[in-house]
């Protein structure tokens, strides 16, 4: 899945950086550098999305149709 999401990155008081994604509640990351914080955030987003998809699919009947849609 490809998506463009917002990463908000701030310096942490104790050093390093933390990052959040406002479009994905609960998605956050941290690291010693901005690059590490972004990588940590990307991993968190992937895990959250995969987990939510698994939860949704568990309740669907077998005959449900799953398609990909593009949003410009």
Swiss-Prot record:
Belongs to the UPF0150 family. InterPro entries: TA_system_antitoxin, TTHA1013/TTHA0281-like. One of its GO terms (biological process) is regulation of DNA-templated transcription. It comes from the Bacteria. This is UPF0150 protein ssl0738. The lineage of its organism: Bacteria, Bacillati, Cyanobacteriota, Cyanophyceae, Synechococcales.
């Amino acid at each position: 899945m490809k998506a463009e999401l917002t990463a908000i990155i701030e310096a942490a008081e104790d050093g390093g950086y933390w990052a959040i994604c406002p479009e994905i509640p609960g998605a956050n990351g941290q690291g010693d550098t901005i690059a590490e914080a972004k990588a940590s955030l990307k991993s968190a987003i992937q895990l959250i999305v995969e987990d939510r998809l698994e939860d949704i699919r568990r309740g669907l009947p077998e005959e449900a149709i799953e398609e990909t849609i593009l949003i410009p």
